[in-house]
Regions:
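Sec-dependent signal peptide recognition
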Residues: 2-12
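Primary mode marks residue(s) on the alpha4-beta5-alpha5 output face of response regulator receiver
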Residues: 22-200
């Protein structure tokens, strides 16, 4: 099973980034724009059939495949809407990684039935790779702030199963974020990952 997971992750890591649907020319506060922005955090074969939630967890579109797409930015949405999809930090999560996200936001221990996966093809605004819940680069550990482009995340049922991976995010290889904490997970860069930071 472990070797299967390694080969599966390797195939994702080397695959090209899937083309997102065309951004609608409408207000970023609109239901149509939000559905586009959040659902394109995953490849279309996942995002097109996923449930889409807004920042208040209200359903914008009911899905059919068990995945949920929503903004991942914990900061309040501006009155005029997010500037772009990157600022919204949207995620598309399966059932298990959604449990992980809820535990992370409530500072409780994730209780998963299996490993979970979460897509973020629009990237994020930055994280301290060593410490959870650091919102600003000025508060981060020196040299450990990374603003990510497109990536996939593996949220492990047991963090020890990924403990042997590097924490170095500068190599282009999958790496550990929040190592040693209950929120340790594997970051898997895909094409475009370093568009907001220095490439290897």
């Amino acid at each position: 099973m472990y070797l299967y997971r390694v080969f599966f992750l390797a195939s994702l890591w080397t695959a090209p980034l899937f083309a997102a649907a065309t951004e609608p020319d409408t207000s970023h506060q609109s239901k149509k724009w939000q559905i586009w922005a959040y659902s394109t955090a995953a490849p279309s074969f996942i995002g097109d059939s996923a449930t889409v939630l807004d920042q208040n967890n209200d359903v914008l579109r009911q899905g059919t495949n068990g995945w949920t797409c929503m903004p991942g930015n914990a900061r309040p949405m501006p009155q005029t809407g997010w500037d772009d999809a990157h600022q919204a930090m949207p995620v598309c999560a399966d059932v298990e990684s959604l449990k992980w996200m809820q535990a992370y936001l409530t500072e409780t221990i994730p209780q998963l039935n299996r490993d979970g996966f979460m897509w973020m093809l629009h990237g994020d605004l930055g994280e301290d790779n060593t410490t959870p819940m650091v919102m600003h680069q000025a508060d981060s550990t020196d040299g450990h702030w990374i603003e990510s482009g497109p990536h996939l995340m593996l949220m492990p049922k047991d963090p020890q199963t990924i403990a042997g991976h590097t924490t170095d995010f500068r190599t282009g290889a999958p790496y550990l974020m929040f190592a040693g904490s209950p929120y340790a997970h594997l970051m898997i860069p895909v094409e475009g990952y370093y568009q907001y930071s220095t490439a290897p």
